[in-house]
Amino acid sequence: MRTLLFLLLSGITSFAVADQDAMQKLNALLADPAAQQQAYAAGHERITFCKHCHGEDGNSKRNYIPNLAEQNPIYLFNAFEKFANGERTDFVMSKLAKSLNIEDRVNIALYYGQQKVVVTPSELPELHDKGQAKFNQVCQGCHGVNGEGKEDMPRLAGQPAEYITRTLKNFRSKDPSRAASIMLSITENMTDEEINSVASYIQELDI
């Protein structure tokens, strides 16, 4: 957990998205192992609304909603910040992020980052090879060879195919809420078959 907090602190510093209050809270956590355990417990307590969609263990209850389990905590924290400041918009998440203080966001990101993804078999296994080829071509450069994600790129491995499909199609249609994303140019020439195949492949990725 100390390693996760160190990464989270480093990521916040590099992306410069948190204020001084967040930095002070994170430094306090790093200096106090007992506080780290408390932060995890506090994150668990604060997922009252999150768990209705994303599950208590971070595995979504609806296939069009992303898993948060094993997501990079730096990415999660920064996603909260973007929803809170309006850089990203979503009917539910925009309101929820604004209702959480910085400490809550840190604790929730830490909590969900420690959960384990439950990988489910694809309903379209015949698309595996095509999906793998497309993933290797357009996804792995940013999201990792196994879809493990990075500090500024989400983990894809094990995400529901329906969620990935919807997300890619939204990017392809130039979703204005993600206007600055590199994904708009990546998806603009993807066919429905390519989107379905890569989504099917991603759902089965187990790392």
Language-model-detected regions and their locations in the chain:
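Positively charged n-region of N-terminal signal peptides that target proteins for export
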Residues: 1-4
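N-terminal signal peptide c-region/cleavage motif recognized by signal peptidases
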Residues: 11-14
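Electrostatic cytochrome c docking/interface patches
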Residues: 19-47, 113-134
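C-terminal capping alpha-helices of c-type cytochrome domains
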Residues: 21-29, 98-120, 162, 186-207
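Gly/Gly-Pro-rich "capping" loops immediately C-terminal to redox-active cysteine motifs
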Residues: 40, 58-88, 94, 98-99, ...
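The canonical Cys-X-X-Cys-His
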Residues: 50-57, 108, 138-146, 198
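Inter-heme linker and motif-flanking segments adjacent to c-type heme-binding CXXCH motifs
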Residues: 59-60, 87-89, 114-126, 141, ...
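Conserved hydrophobic/aromatic "anchor" residues
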Residues: 83, 111-112, 135, 171, ...
